């Protein structure tokens, strides 16, 4: 259980170009001239979300830069995430584990990029994804960046882009997949209708480097109604080895897998239920649960205590074959750190409890 801070500190406005968790907060909410019924635009620049060079992603007034506690793995791409709402609009708290209730007119923005791209050791933006909340529901808009990094253009058909970069001290390469509209819906759906994934209080309820709680900052700038409970169950940063191992794996599965392995989602026919709110019961994670699909007779359970070689989930997370990998979409590489976390958790278990 994580507790919301009830004392607000001095609110510092930072307009920065880095990706640290305590920027960028701009407390001016401005319509920006966006007519929601005209969207999506043909180019990203038409929205006026950013000031200066668009590739620098410095948000304009009314665009809030947020961070989840744990992030979805997408072939090691980095992300910048933003929220824009029409003037006077606010989101509402529903529950710890449910999406914030965003008003019509909300636009969610997510940019995917790499640093240290070869051969020139530069930053390269791959794509910017929008989810636009209209009266008819949420709509997708996918923008692919041009070679000069001067703008991104609407393209809902999907494509691949080869890229190589330095990850720490290692050279990595990916045939990076930019999703089609159909692929967006596979992950972003509930009962067949498009929905966002990460903007739940459980994912936002943590202190930024400034010491301010992120949910309280949303309230302070006028983007969230001040109706939060005093306690909110929250995920942790799964990369933090100082956090509880169970909490780390549950947080990892929630952000990487639960969008498909939940009721009325794409893989709801499978026995796993991987939302953070459900994995306090390890059976929902697949511990000592037989898989519904036999790939290899040795894989006797989804998760087998103390034995990664008999655990279906470990096999799927370690695979890059599109017929067997997990997640189904969003990666072509193995998330080595995620697999290591799963191995550590499996090896810590001695029985089915």
PLM-predicted stretches and their roles:
Residues 102-105:
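Short, well-ordered loop/turn sites that connect or cap secondary structure elements
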Residues 97-100:
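Short, surface-exposed secondary-structure edge patches
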Residues 20-29, 117-353:
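Sequence context surrounding c-type heme c attachment/ligation sites in exported
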Residues 2-9:
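Sec-dependent signal peptide recognition
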Residues 15-18:
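C-terminal motif of bacterial Sec signal peptides marking the signal peptidase cleavage site
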Residues 26-94, 113-115, 124-131, 137-155:
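Conserved small-residue
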